[in-house]
Amino acid sequence: MHVLLVGNYEPDRQESMRRFVDCLLRELPRHGVNVELVRPTVWFGRRRIGGGLDKWLAYLDKYVLFPPVLRRRIQRAPSGSIVHVGDHSNSVYLRDDLEPRQIVTCHDLLAVRGALGEPTDCPASPAGKLLQRAILRGLQRAGLVVCDSTATENDFRRLTGGRRRSQVVRLGLNGPFRRLGLKETRAGLASLGSVLLDRPFLVLVGSSLRRKNREFALHLLARLKPRWPGLLVFAGEGLSKSQQALRDALDVGDRVIVVQRPSHEVLEALYNQAHALLYPSRFEGFGWPIIEAQACGCPVVCSNTTSLPEVAGNGALIRDVDDEEGFVADILSLHDRARREALVRSGYENVKRFQPERMIADYVAAYRSLATP
């Protein structure tokens, strides 16, 4: 079986999409699948003009230069090859004449929903609205749409009228996250100084996008400040200007640490040392940090929105996304050793559902279903 795997444009720096594609490239050959990666070449995108024009140069690479390249690669591929678009935002590359042999992974439809006027904290410009509509049309040219979660599949069926074939294949862990010993944890945190070894902290992993709800986390920290001596670590992107302003207005600057683009070793150590993963997102398609934390024995406190309850299972304390006092109560409750240990055990049990081997086996079965006349 031959699969032509369509990857992302590298300058877009879509880390979660890169990790997903890397997992497929690494694991599929072990299941007898020959995988060939193809993605847009950076040509016009090498130039830096500024003034908002860089995005349009990238569009030339992605939407003008790449489609004929992909078409030629498909023509040269072995007969019966499957075309797998690894990120739904690239569904614009799907073709009507190849529908039965095209599969696309839909990680979420938040941007599409935002472009259609739904409240997802994903506003779209006029050009963005056109692109998101093109993405939705592209999804409907696939022979099979694989969604990361039931929540995302429900969105897909609703937006397309349930006319296209779809199924759920939940993501697997994207790295070897595990419980570390004290020595390994200290080594992983060494580059961040001693403060994270001396004081308890919550870790919030992800970008600074509005839907990640960092502002809510800062308000939680302000509520916790007189009752708990801990810190809040933002791992991922730096704080936006508005988030910095809110941090200062709430007078919690001395309690906030930002770790930008942590390595796997640093992130794993953060999970191992943290009082809990705080994950109050308003909208998600999956929620990888939840299972990463659970695999490391880190308690999880998260919101009850979109895919998060489905992913967290019984291994998290789950609250309404606007329930500040409830989140505070759950965070403080983890001082109870028995409650904490029970939650950690439930997390270990839950993460068994998300082994990469299971995800890969499901994708191989999906490929075979398309390859069979």
Regions found by a protein language model. Name each.
Residues 1-373:
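Carbohydrate transferase catalytic cores enriched for Leloir-type hexosyltransferases
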